[in-house]
C-alpha cells in the first residue's frame, strides 16, 4: 500500500478515521486547493471513510470569495457522490470563516458530506465522536503525529 506524505499542517489518525487540518496564517484559494487535494488523495482507494476536523483557529487572514467557495463545495459534493457519509467539523472564530463555513453547511445539505461549524473545540470533538484531547494536543506539542497515511 502506498503512503501519502502529508503537509505539516495535516495529521491523519488512521485508528479513529480522522483527518485534522490546522492551517496558520492566510486562508486563500491556494490553501483550500491544497487541503482538498490531500483529502481527495486519501479518499482514493480507501474502504473506510474518514471524518475531517478543520481547526481554523490559527488563521490570521482570509482571502476567499463566494464564487470560489461555492465552486469548491459543488466540486466536493460531486466528487464524494456515492460514498459513505462523512462529517466535516470546522472550528472557526473569525467572522469570514464562520460565514464561509455556514455557506458550506448549506451547500452540502442532502449530500454525503455533513458539515457543521463550531466556535467551541469541545462541541466539535463531541459531534465527531473523538476525544477533545486529540483536538487540542498538537497545539501543546503532545500529539504523536502521523506524517504518512495509507490510501
What do these predicted ranges mean?
Residues 1-151:
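Amphipathic, Lys/Arg-enriched alpha-helical "gate/interface" segment within cytosolic domains
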Amino acid at each position: 500500500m502506498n503512503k501519502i506524505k502529508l503537509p505539516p499542517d495535516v495529521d491523519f489518525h488512521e485508528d479513529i478515521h480522522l483527518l485534522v487540518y490546522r492551517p496558520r496564517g492566510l486562508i486563500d484559494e491556494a490553501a483550500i486547493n491544497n487541503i482538498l487535494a490531500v483529502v481527495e488523495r486519501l479518499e482514493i482507494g480507501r474502504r473506510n471513510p474518514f471524518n475531517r476536523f478543520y481547526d481554523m483557529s490559527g488563521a490570521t487572514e482570509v482571502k476567499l470569495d463566494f464564487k470560489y467557495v461555492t465552486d469548491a463545495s459543488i466540486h466536493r459534493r460531486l466528487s464524494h457522490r456515492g460514498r459513505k457519509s462523512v462529517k466535516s467539523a470546522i472550528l472557526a472564530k473569525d467572522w469570514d470563516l464562520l460565514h464561509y463555513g455556514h455557506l458550506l453547511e448549506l451547500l452540502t445539505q442532502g449530500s454525503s458530506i455533513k458539515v457543521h461549524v463550531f466556535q467551541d473545540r469541545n462541541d466539535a470533538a463531541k459531534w465527531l465522536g473523538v476525544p477533545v484531547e486529540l483536538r487540542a494536543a498538537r497545539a501543546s506539542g503532545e500529539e504523536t503525529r502521523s506524517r504518512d497515511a495509507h490510501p
